[in-house]
């Protein structure tokens, strides 16, 4: 879990602004128009990710910050009604998250790599059981990603208009499922939770757009989206995460 002692005041301030702007997004437009210019009302969706992007320049790893920036651009394109642009920028965001997870795993200290797959292995058990635990984690991650990708390809993609949009959706589905699988390989529950919320948001959005209307879709999509992004960002900026994790292995 996230160690609150590793979160500084700048991060707390960032989260406060993020939550405030997220609440503003859900305020009805007629109410907002009484106090804000029309352009601010139209593009208010970008506020929370703009906050994470700007703060991330100083607080977060570079790849995570790039993921937030591309997500911000995706939000802007969505508000502007450009679905292809929206999908393209979010695909880039997932590519950055994939790179972040790969880099993070490859650069873990050797002692943490040694202990992270021994967590479920009893003391004194043969070392090969740790290898089996690692293999099981990889298999479970790949299976989950494959199942979700199969669901997207069979239940959603056939309803997408043929052509560039459908091709883009297939590529996007592969990227986001890969991102989820890699988040699970981190063996850090919050990374996996954030990625899962992000994916759930996209499933609801695509189902609502291409298959059939989803009740309360705005709230289901945006609450899970904002929550997932915030969890990913917060987990990435936590100080001394590797040291804390290794001490608890």
Language-model features: locations:
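Polytopic alpha-helical membrane-helix bundles and their juxtamembrane interface segments
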Residues: 2-249
């Amino acid at each position: 879990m996230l160690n609150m002692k590793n979160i500084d005041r700048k991060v707390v301030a960032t989260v406060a602004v993020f939550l405030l702007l997220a609440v503003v997004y859900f305020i009805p437009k007629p109410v907002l128009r009484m106090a804000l210019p029309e352009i601010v009302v139209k593009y208010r969706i970008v506020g929370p990710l703009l906050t994470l992007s700007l703060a991330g320049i100083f607080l977060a790893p570079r790849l995570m910050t790039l993921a937030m920036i591309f997500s911000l651009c995706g939000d802007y394109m969505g508000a502007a009604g450009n679905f292809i642009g929206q999908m393209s920028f979010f695909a880039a965001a997932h590519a950055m998250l994939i790179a972040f997870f790969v880099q993070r795993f490859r650069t873990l200290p050797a002692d943490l790599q040694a202990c992270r797959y021994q967590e479920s292995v009893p003391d004194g058990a043969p070392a090969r059981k740790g290898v089996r635990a690692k293999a099981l984690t990889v298999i479970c991650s790949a299976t989950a990603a494959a199942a979700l990708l199969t669901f997207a390809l069979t239940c959603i993609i056939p309803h997408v208009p043929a052509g560039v949009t459908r091709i883009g959706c297939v590529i996007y589905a592969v990227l986001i499922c890969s991102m989820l699988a890699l988040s699970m390989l981190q063996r850090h529950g919050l990374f996996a939770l954030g990625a899962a919320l992000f994916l759930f948001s996209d499933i609801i959005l695509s189902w609502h757009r291409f298959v059939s209307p989803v009740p309360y879709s705005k709230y289901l999509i945006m609450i899970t989206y904002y929550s997932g992004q915030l969890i990913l960002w917060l987990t990435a900026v936590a100080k001394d995460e590797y040291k804390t994790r290794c001490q608890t292995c």
